[in-house]
Amino acid sequence: MQVTVETLEGLERRLNITVPAANIEDAVTAELRNIAKNRRFDGFRKGKVPMKMVAKMYGKAVRQDILGEVMQRHFIEAIIKEKINPAGAPTFAPVENKEGSDLVFNATFEVYPEVELKGLENITVEKPAVEVKDADVEEMIETLRKQQATWTEVEEAAEAGKRVSIDFVGSIDGEEFEGGKAENFPLEMGAGRMIPGFEDGIEGKTKGMEFEIDVTFPEDYHAENLKGKAAKFAIKVNKVEARQLPELNDEFVAKFGVAEGGIDALKAEVRKNMERELKQAVKNRIKEQAIDGLVKENEIDVPAALIDQEINVLRQQAAQRFGGNVEAAMQLPRELFEEQAKRRVVVGLLLGEVIKAHELKVDEEKVKAIITEMATAYEDPTEVVTYYEQNEQLMNNMRNVALEEQAIDAIIAKAQVSEKEVSFNELMNQPA
């Protein structure tokens, strides 16, 4: 076998491979003999059919199969010989394929980028200095009260904190548009659910009032046909409601699974949950900055094959979120996923290089700690830990999580780390 390697654009490579004719012809002959020996032919005893007849009937198909097998096998031998690491399946193209002549073919494919980590010392990480304060717990209790609130109709004007039930019809240039019409639509005033100006137009209105408002859809509105358009809404207020918050008593506390200890026990449970969420949020914020810095300092080419694979993964995940229709999800345009897919591939390649450069191995104690911490969110943590320990696939997933955390720790060890005081709400409400 003769092999030459061509470097094409970017990460693309081409192997030019020559296989001696004898290799092909010997393989074809062996397969034809196998057919003659084991297949029945009319008018002949098994194994007694003439080889010329077998070759005439099956020679062409057998040769095509053999060529495919030979190209695949010799490609693998070639990349091992040349120490090449393909990032995806090759595309084969025969160049010389005459019977009795050497087989000449090429294989075009992408390789993984060569990554040399740099700039870890330039990465800046602001570690949030934050704790759960009494005021944060009280605010969370109020949020829980609002979630359990009831609404009572009142003879008052619409304002922030109240809820209105409205009918509305939207139009642009006098024409109604799709999605711009509703009846008995519940709208909590001050929640910011509607486009700018919509709630302002309802402010101060009372039950039975009918009126029109003029608004403009934002330029970044999700519906392409409405972006930046001026619209008119005809609105009728059917009723105005005020929120009735439940009292902080044992009945309220019991709704959250706290059987004893009253409101103090609920506050303690809420604080514990908030502290667990806060710890994870701090970890996520640090990880996000470390990865952002890693990507910024290390620009690399990305194999298109890996991006395609990741796009398919994202499509399948989308299908699971939206009813399991994989076929429909696979038809979604790749542009929806391309940026996220490329980012995930880049991060994966760079973190892999961090792991390699620092010779990191999975810390089994860290794996146990991650599982134990995660299990505290469940009613029976011991049962959860046991379930994970008895499931090898879940354990391998957790080992990957632990190894990634070890890689992040390695980045942070070389980065410029400072602390910044923030409140609980500031951190938890930061955009992703």
Swiss-Prot record:
Organism whose genome encodes this protein: Vibrio vulnificus (strain CMCP6)
Compartments, record wording: Cytoplasm
Name of the gene encoding the protein in the UniProt record: tig
GO biological process: 'de novo' cotranslational protein folding; cell division; chaperone-mediated protein folding; protein transport; protein unfolding
UniProt name for this protein: Trigger factor
E.C. number: 5.2.1.8
Catalysed reaction, written as an equation: [protein]-peptidylproline (omega=180) = [protein]-peptidylproline (omega=0)
GO molecular function, one term: protein folding chaperone
Domain of life: Bacteria
Keywords: Cell cycle, Cell division, Chaperone, Cytoplasm, Isomerase, Rotamase
GO cellular component terms attached to this protein's record: cytoplasm
InterPro entries: PPIase_dom_sf, PPIase_FKBP_dom, Trig_fac, Trigger_fac_C, Trigger_fac_C_sf, Trigger_fac_ribosome-bd_bac, Trigger_fac_ribosome-bd_sf, Trigger_fact/SurA_dom_sf
Its biological purpose: Involved in protein export. Acts as a chaperone by maintaining the newly synthesized protein in an open conformation. Functions as a peptidyl-prolyl cis-trans isomerase.
Enzyme's top EC category: isomerase
Notes on the domains: Consists of 3 domains; the N-terminus binds the ribosome, the middle domain has PPIase activity, while the C-terminus has intrinsic chaperone activity on its own.
PPIase FKBP-type domain: residues covered: 161-246
Gene3D superfamilies per UniProt: 3.10.50.40, Trigger factor ribosome-binding domain (3.30.70.1050), Trigger factor, C-terminal domain (1.10.3120.10)
SUPFAM superfamilies: FKBP-like (SSF54534), Triger factor/SurA peptide-binding domain-like (SSF109998), Trigger factor ribosome-binding domain (SSF102735)
Family: Belongs to the FKBP-type PPIase family. Tig subfamily.
